């Protein structure tokens, strides 16, 4: 049995090593005769002699082709002749391949990126895990004093536990008197003992849970610090760490390091993937969790070490049990795809399919297509296709429900209609299958490459399932089940209204992404490139806010292109705990953190409780801001700027304007040279229009000078002398068409205002006084005809407003509860700058002190900001502004059309990115354009309500953007047929008296109204399955999945059912996070039971009312009110002081150590102020002294847990609360809809 394969180098040549188990013994086989190679397709075979001469350099060594061979292959089913180019060493391939590809005679090169040892297994037809050898297993787990946020490997390893079929043991270096504990003298001796244990037991498989990213990297770090070589390999080598995507992977030579964590993440869907949660989900048994702070306390004090040792032992034991449960399926997958378990267990489904296809392609003499380069990959990512059909659920409580499901719908469609890249639109075929709606044709004259392989897989799976039914041997049954599950794994493998901040010409503005891209594409239609249905507009002067995934720093990056394409399918409406939200397709991703690494997570992969990256601190360009008042006035209608004048003192300018115009006429050859022309020529030179010569001047820009002449002609025509002010005066409206032509140097000399009113300069320096006044206006100001009013009940605030306004505009009027500033200029400034109560764009790029002053005016206190508005735009602007000064602790609430934004403390965030958790996900149907930006380097951008970082992604194998056999037409054809067949089933069902309650892609739920005999419903459903299967083509098959006594459907992906044995099945309704109290979880469970088991909605409502009554009357025991939240970082890094952080701080004040990983349990008390000030630990709670906050638990715990269920029956939140006056509930009129 082959366990693994690699290669080593001797004398510059590669030697393949095959690690095997044979007749119970471990052995290594060597092959010195296998050489690396690539394929090259040439335009002209005569060029092969030139190709042979190509050389490259690798570490000072000359790399060259050592042998060539012309061979016959097929490419996408068509015969092709290619050259096989042999090289001396596997590392020669990346060194020389680009030079070969760049030769003019080379069309392309192929199969140059298949690792050498994997290539060997494929070419030699060797299959890992084949045979009946008995493997030995050992699970390993460690306990450390490391805490998240500390230097990795700084704290010691305090316990190492291991488990095998003989039992579990713990090694430690503190005295613990337990039979399974071995005590050594030091950490160093403990690690050396582990090395001896592994050598003595000599396991074939070492099982860990997150050993790739924690246990082994940590052990390696500690061993290095302690001067030990961690020699665990069968070749006496140390574990080898390597990067694998966003994570690490650890290899132990000669042994299979089987890390359960990636396997379980790929295999089962859970709300959390702690070892305890996984064990309970798989085996149905709870496992105690001992938290990091408890371990640290026990180690420091010596009290409770026995509990920690037991926990460590159970970790190893549980890891061993889980490993034995999951390893057989991974072994079967390894046999199927022909690659070692180490690789298979760390591969995505897409990669598993790829390895399977590569092996089968070699067997069939097919040349594998290349993976896409970055440009092609980006193009594929922009492509989209309509997904499966989803029917909106029928509301209400239903009985007698059958579940029908297509067996392997998409693989069956691929086989039935021969959907494959090599059959797509193939010319000269006698028979084609044409995909509905999309119209792609697939040749039926020969079996396609992928359909034929899928056919074999599904046929094999059906044979196995048949053998499972016939087998009496439980061991054989289990092995067969693992194989059929492995086959199943292999066989199935941003919207217009979102807010987008963009930076253009160093100015920040918010746009709706759809409106913006639509307008840009329509206005620049001649520059738009089309790739299928995708429209791409390349842009130059646009920037987007993004972050660098390596440095985790905010960056302002160029936008390379605006992109849109048609889409019809699912969109995911994602709401975060902070109140942020976004709608994305399953082809777009947000960013999350897994195992300390940033990773992309698609919309269809996210689930409540997941962490999502949002901005903590944003870097915007900052500079001193100056407002041009003339530009503001030009934005107003002409009637609103009537009676506004511009003035300039006469002193020093007598006859200047006439003299300048005469000089300009002379320059243009339309008059004589004025006697005083020199004065005006010097002025024109200062402005950059001319260059003075000994006799006259040289005009540098005739067009600009012509416009300048037009300005002066208009000035002379309209200029008047005002004797009282000894100034020239001109009406602003008379200059509207030309005032923008006035050079800034001249414009600065003018003042502006009403003839008899105060005047101000044409340029306003944005200082902290002006910024604060703007903040006051947005918060409480309004404009009327020719006046601005600021309102406040606080006299101190009014006095501050008055002082700031007088500084800029002169005298103000004080009224009761308001300050009034009269005049058209003040009206114009606030009307234009803050139109619609938005934050002026220049505030975002102002220096920090200006932003802070603005926020103080907006809220009166920038330290603890609270702000309410009905404007989505203003909410987004405010969040961007707060992020730009480093404030990330932001919460958004929305109630009755009003948004409320608040922060707990204005402090700088320590990081440019922070994490927010997903609160809810709604799936909706959408048809129309979806939009995207291509952003330089980072390929992510800030978008959505409340601002999140978004990125593109992919789904499906044919639609998997990195796939070699990528085929967008195949993917959209498969889903089109899928929609057609599920709709056919729906129509046929309804024609036979069934009512379809809900459809999602490949399955549906239905009942027969009026039929009370459930056996008849089942019988008719089974008859229908036989009938429809007789009509379905090919291998398509509808299956009877089960029967449910009762159920209800809230929205898509949210429903609850109960089977005949009383087992409740829910989807999308569960509350499983720690921050739900027991009373909330218990109430939801009782509500589901009342509705599903008893069929009584009114009983469910009564349960809720009873609970709210008990809460109101303080009759709920405190242990049911505890809310648990985990400390995820050092306390001093928290900017938002949530209740768990506040409690943690009080614990620290009492001398209790609080570190990341510690879970804080707290109860919220009655009282005023934020809940962080009213939360106390469960240990502190004394029922004689304390009263919990009943309103908090009703509104934030119990009602949210049940509201999502009962709204399906027409109930609103207010219907569910206990009230002293008895009311009749809606349930009195809701009848169970029986079959």
Swiss-Prot record:
Transmembrane segments: none annotated. Its EC number is 2.7.7.7. It comes from the Archaea. GO terms for molecular function: DNA binding; DNA-directed DNA polymerase activity; endonuclease activity; nucleotide binding. GO terms for biological process: DNA-templated DNA replication; intein-mediated protein splicing. It comes from Pyrococcus horikoshii (strain ATCC 700860 / DSM 12428 / JCM 9974 / NBRC 100139 / OT-3). InterPro entries: DNA-dir_DNA_pol_B, DNA-dir_DNA_pol_B_CS, DNA-dir_DNA_pol_B_exonuc, DNA-dir_DNA_pol_B_multi_dom, DNA/RNA_pol_sf, DNA_pol_B_thumb, DNA_pol_palm_dom_sf, DNA_pol_type-B. This is DNA polymerase. The gene is pol. It catalyses: DNA(n) + a 2'-deoxyribonucleoside 5'-triphosphate = DNA(n+1) + diphosphate. CDD domains: DNA_polB_Kod1_like_exo, Hint.
